[in-house]
């Protein structure tokens, strides 16, 4: 049975549970659970992670923990009973876990590993806390480490800062806001300190300890590597100050054996010392670690003699130094141990041994020897900081290693009271000794003993250095042969204090012989007592001691024999009569020592001894007291208690005589303890006063003297002694109070009234001193300052003798006596406030009784200072302390009164102060940036204000509001507090991560607003309505709801729950307040329309549904009120749209916001009660329509916002912007917003360097302006100016952008428009400039090369696309050099989630509605709108190139497909063309690089119609070319004509036209298609026409052919006869051919019949210039039948059966084989290698080597564009089928066949032809080609092939040289043929910038020398073919293909562009605006030699689908005329 648990309430999961039982709760190890019930080994409860899910789990899976249960029952809460910091570590680690993993995902690897390390440390520290084995100090230290790491991690992860007190998280409810603010500051500083890793030697920021913290150097000797000494050695280490030239520390001694190891085996790894008590000043000294090496052994190291084994001498060997500054630079952390190597240098001269370390430091290399490489001391150093106890506690391992404490010589900066020292440091300086009759100098050794008064040698009183035990004797080192040795060794003498008096030192001098015996002979001694007769110790000085002669036989047993002798010169003066019969006689030798005493018990000061023994000198007492000031502080603190006892004894002895002197001495000693060096002796003083002071009568004299000093302060000029007495006030009162207590005890409280009276009088004197005007007396000012500083320190002493109220009255009177801030200087202001601050912080102020007395005077002073804006930081500190005390005392009844007092005194002035500070802060940030001081002051006062408001309750607010005398006062107060609150939220006073502080602030604000809103409603509605106050209130509410800290949606769920549990959702609270106040406005709502629409709209952007639901009705209300007032709600509408735009652009709003205004729509429908006030139904309809528009606007704005804030591509951003811009213009007619987005779009184009688009975009704004002088306001970046000026500036900018975009044709009309304006204003300077600009644009058009862009159709399908793209299709203008493959890759990179569709079919609904992204991309061909320019023969191709691809709105692509059964022998019977024409919304180029497709038209072209178009286009091309030669427009050679004729005739002979005959002239076809009779007749007429044209062509060719080319001509005649014969039966009239064609011809039989049909096994390649280019750019096929299907027949290539999917290299190889293989001779006549997967309109002539992975090659007999519909059998072979556009006017790639090789080389003719063509086909950069492919020449030879054995002879050598003649196109049958004199390899937009006028290598015949004149543009003139003259000029030749093609579309209407209409010709009959039409007369009819009359008509050709009605005639001329005119078509 399940029973509720009593004790088992909380536990931790120790084993994961899968919840495999019914109602089982899934648990993971480490989770915590709250247990509700138990039953037989099972628990029922919840996981704290998911508190809403209850379940079962095994009891043995849970580790129970103690917990505190509150509110037992169904809603009980359980808190684990554990250390709060353990709980915090647990929750923090859980929060960090997910964030830590994200760091790795975001590639923040460094922080990832750092955080992992910190998390492991926290886990370990938490484990230590839980162990329960730590001491309190250790627990505190562990907590400190934990908090540092927690704060560090939170800081780096961007989490909230946690305020702490004593390492515990504080509860914001339990402390004042001021304290909370200070804790945040403290936590921030500790985080910054732990993060910054600054130089850790510096004092930490924020340390409040006044004591200097000492440093300590840990030293460890690792090894001494040497091989040359071979003897034992002593190494002494010490710290040396190079600047002072002295040693500052004791020596650390290490004894080493001859191997370099410690002599004592126990010292291994324990040769370490701690150099202690180094001050900050010491660390700045030029310190060195100096090591002196003393060897112990033979006298001479290189002496081979073996001396006596028992005699060892201490001999100097070497020295090493290390700079401490270098150490400090390398030690980056305090506790980092680092190794160093010290090189040991040896001394060259032993006499300079004492200076060797200085010489090494100075690098005096001549005085020491460089060390051997093997010599070196390896040491490690570590720097510590802190007191010794702390170091010992933090580093126990170091102190366990036998650490030698090495102290400073002398006392440290801080002398600790318990530090007992009695050390005498003695230095053996030098000696001067006689030679003693010896020839060499002595080797002197000094031996020293310490002897007691009885002659006993003191044991262990000599220390050579720390680290080794003390000894009883000392032996100096020996300097070889030196009678004036200098030792410089420092010996420490730790003599017990009780043995010091009477002890003396004895120095014995011995000569150490180097002879065999090695004796040490005593020759003298010296001595020195340690204390003088007057009781002082040996002074710290150098002492010269007398040396007395003696020998080894002398005895020192009776020390009295020599102690009576003078030891030194000073002593000699005291012993004038020395008998000469003494045993010891003084020699002339001398010995020098120096001493330094560091003792806390002994003194060297005579004056101090005199004071302590004052009774011995009664007549000198006044002098002794006066000289006390000259005693050093160290001596005074050492004997502090004795001195104080002496002073008070003297005071009791004679008060009147010595009272003032004792008082002054006491003041001196008290002030001495204020020195930081002796600060730690204050406890000694306190202990003395409490336990040892016995002056019961002293208080009387002390009060008297103190009062006398104060009374004299107004008269005396020098007041140094008075100021010292004021500074000593604290301890003087301690003595006074303790003395009075002692007296009261002794007398049972006698003289109490006298004492109280004296204190009263003393305070009167104090008040007198403070009331004096010190503005003119600096001395008095210092006295007052000293008094005020000390005054708060006496409160605790007074409380021992007086009640709290009495002391408070004393203090109030004193503080009240101070002059106001107006009458004192600034420095005194500071001191006064500091005194008040210390008063507030004192224990006295914590009593409510005293606060009631003191608070008014404190508030009075603060109020005055705040009014004057003086010392704001100190005032804020005082207020913070007051609020802190009030908060802690908030349970007391008196607090209500105190808060009331503060509200009356402070609230208003606090608000005013904050407003002033905030305005200054704002101004400073604007000028100088963030100011930390100003920010700190602002934060302090904000926390004070919040503290006060938090303490206020209903009563306080009610009293506050009732106390206002008028509504104006109330209004002023409300405006102030609302303004402060607004600034609080706008200025971000508290940092972002101070979440606790921010939430508390918000809670206080919303509570305060709730109190004040009723006053606002009550006082400022109806007749007293005040817009300013209400507006301020609404603005505050809006700002409050929008605060980032309140947006709970972006924080973790745990944190959100915590906030909601504590505060609730304060946004909802404020929203309800806002709505309520709005409803209270009544008819005054109209005042806030439209002003508050934007702010309220901002509130709806908060992603909180309840807030949105509250706010939406307000908008309906606004619309309703404006409708009532104005009859419409245009203002609401305009403002709503404007604010929506700006806010969403700033990144606000979310996805659910799209549906927000749907809520508003409901208000017009389901709730008719809301419409009762609406009188007309139209209001409802208008409202719904408006909301619908706003909703659509929201969709676009959010799309725009998402594009802009993300890393989206240029196309997306432009598309969003254009979409939004059009919406503003067309749907809601917001011109200003429209113009704003015009400029945004322009900026995007400029950034992407789309200058043409930028110009068109700006042109939209320009068109809105007129040439008027209407003034325009400042807008965007435009200044205030007239409309004329702005339009002029815009025009100039647009012209500049058109120029940069190379779109000069668009810029010229603007130039003309500006010129008209300048001319009308007679501004000739500007007119000159603009005309020059226009002229330069004409030059640029003619001279500069421009690339023709490609165009691509893109379909965006699926719901995942942005709104403006979804399920739409666009045509995009590609970038320069961009082909289809590159464009597709770009689109897929822009939409990485998109899938490229593999077919061109229109997608079905499943794709359109799916949640995915599909892209359908293929290339399309532009259809120019304007054709006049393109039809003119004399217009340069660079001009035409522009009009072919600009101002284009229609595009098309073709798709070949088979309809019906497919004939394997002739596929053209069923091959249809599906032609799609796309019409865009706008022309390209325009304001975007792409526009949406507005309309699409689909037409199917039958096979027969396709054949008609192919033959017709070839006929037009032939006529044009022949006409050029007849008019001698192409002079010199006739290669172009030769190749063109060869291509047509050869293709016809080898199966070209025959295929059409087989397909369409068959009886079966005619029977099955009776409706095609007319078209079949038309095709027959065109074939007949072609025969006639070929006949004329051959006649012209015969006339001009070079003799060497006669074999070719003969071959053409023969093949022509075969062609005519093959068509004889169909066209009976063909047997009557002109003599020119038949004279020399012999029929060869029906070649067509024997020719194998074109099958898939043969190579079939699509020619890119097929006649189906007719509607687009007029491209023609290379033979009459070379394109049964249009070259536009699709955008995918079709391959034959066997060539399907071949790589381009394979195709190329296949074609070469076809030309070399006799099987293919004559059949492969029209070969062109297609471009690759992006074979596109601008494929260049180099595209033959480009791959075609996405294309299919059709089985057509000649070039067709492939179909996107691949035959089923091939679908598997190509996964990617991209629709490609047809090629526009580009020369195709040519591939010349290598027919017959002459000795491995091509025949002469082909060799020459290759040179000619290659010259014209320079390598260029085709964007379709890869880099590897761009290096190849790709030649296109359309059906130019010579049968075997019929090769013409080679051209003469002279014809191979270069000639400036016209080039030929890459293909002899290319659409530019002979007329295109300017035929370009790049054709306008080819990529390499090669000139469009390619060179030709064709030479002239020998009869006609080559011309050197260049092409010109003179008008053409008639020329008779019979004349054998050169033409009088060389005309410019342009492609006939354009006029032929564009005739078909000439009649199509021209679309007006967004640019001015004069950019392009409007009427085809008028001259085009750019450029002007050249003179273009009609050509007269030309008579052919053979009588054939050819007539050129200027009329346009027939359309695509036309009926032919002319029957064939019987007369040849009529046939020729009819054939010639057959190109005229009907529209």
UniProtKB/Swiss-Prot annotation:
Supply the source organism's classification.
Eukaryota, Metazoa, Chordata, Craniata, Vertebrata
**Tissue and organ expression note:** Expressed in brain, spinal cord, pituitary gland, testis. Not expressed in heart, liver, kidney, spleen and lung. In brain, it is highly expressed in the cerebral cortex and hippocampus, while it is absent in other tissues, except in spinal cord. In the cerebral cortex, it is found within the intermediate (III and IV) and deep (V and VI) layers, whereas it is weakly expressed in superficial layer I. It is also abundant in the piriform cortex. Within the hippocampus, it is expressed in the pyramidal neurons of the CA1, CA2, and CA3 regions and the dentate gyrus.
GO CC list: cytoplasm; cytosol
Annotated compartments: Cytoplasm
Q: Provide the disulphide bond pattern.
A: none
Null mutant phenotype reads: DOCK3 knockout mice show sensorimotor impairment and structural changes in several brain regions, including the spinal cord and cerebellum. Structural changes are consistent with central axonal dystrophy and include a disorganized cytoskeletons, and abnormal accumulation of autophagic vacuoles associated with impaired axonal transport. Common features of mutant mice are gait abnormalities, limb weakness, ataxia, and an impaired ability to swim.
Name of the protein described by the UniProt record: Dedicator of cytokinesis protein 3
Q: Where is this region: Disordered?
A: 1672-1695, 1731-1768, 1846-1925, 1971-2027
Main localization, broad class: cytoplasm
Domain comment, in the record's words? The DOCKER domain may mediate some GEF activity.
Gene that this polypeptide is encoded by: Dock3
Top-level taxon: Eukaryota
Occurrences of domain DOCKER (ranges): 1225-1632
Q: Where is the composition biased (Basic and acidic residues)?
A: 1981-1998, 2011-2027
Q: Which PROSITE patterns match?
A: C2_DOCK (PS51650), DOCKER (PS51651), SH3 (PS50002)
The yes or no answer to whether the keyword DNA repair is present is no
Keywords assigned by UniProt, alphabetized: Cytoplasm, Guanine-nucleotide releasing factor, Phosphoprotein, SH3 domain, SH3-binding
Location of Phosphoserine modifications: 1655
* Residue spans of biased composition, Low complexity class: 1676-1695, 1731-1751, 1877-1899
This protein's species is Mus musculus (Mouse)
Query: Where are stretches of biased composition, namely Polar residues?
Result: 1752-1763
Q: Where is the C2 DOCK-type domain?
A: 421-598
